[in-house]
Amino acid sequence: MNVAGKTVVITGASRGIGAEAAGVFAAAGANVALIARSSDAIEKLAAEIGEQAIELTCDVASYASVEGAIAKAKETFGSVDILINNAGVIEPIAHLASADPDEWGTVIDINLKGVFNGMRAVLPMMIASGGGSILTISSGAAHGPVEAWSHYCASKAAVKMLTECVHKENGADGIRAIGLSPGTVATQMQVEIKASGINPVSQLDWDVHIPADWPARALLWMCGSDADQYCGQELSLRDEDLRKRVGLI
């Protein structure tokens, strides 16, 4: 897909996959609306990208905050064509029996409600304009339990179903909803997982994690017609065939 002149909204854009995606999409000619809770990192990133970028401080757990940010992106660039639901957290990592209920709920607010809020805010305008792409970062944790990750596993399983629901309800409206399970990525989240010392994922060597630009480049590829066959589904970047199609290997 030629994304030149298109507008992409990226949540969790301050670091990791989100920040890499901002650079990849901007390099491809897209306008990028950078969403994050703290302003410093996205202000710096927007300045580096230039006129194609706008920074929008936003709490994805609040629908009003997300709706306002999406509206500002549309006001600035004229449209919202692509939404990348990337914002997500995993801390505090804790066993169910000792998890703090409020902290557990906060992860659900960000990882699940944050995705719903983004989808809900963009769908009416995308439908009115004839379509758009809603890409959501998923996880292998959506498919099986991981020790001390009950909040993360539950939120990612629910997010997978949200993608399927959007496809079922709005696929005929031109909405391309696709999930991306990137595998383990060399980001701050893996630093936090490593520090926990809990479960086999925390024991992985750093060099087995893929670089953050891989999922970023996959997200760009997912905006093109080659990915149409995957609408309503979840792609796994562990798949070597997919890596080849994206041009990663």
Label the predicted regions:
Residues 144, 160, 165-175:
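Active-site-adjacent segment of SDR/Rossmann-fold oxidoreductases
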Residues 139:
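Residue(s) in the substrate-gating loop at a strand-loop-helix junction
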Residues 14-15:
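Conserved glycine-rich cofactor-binding loop
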Residues 57-68, 101:
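The beta1-alpha1 cofactor-binding region of Rossmann-like NAD(H)/NADP(H)-dependent oxidoreductases
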Residues 94-96, 103-105:
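Substrate-binding pocket helix/loop in short-chain dehydrogenase/reductase
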Residues 175, 179-182, 187, 196-245:
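C-terminal helical subdomain
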Residues 119, 155:
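Active-site helix of classical SDR
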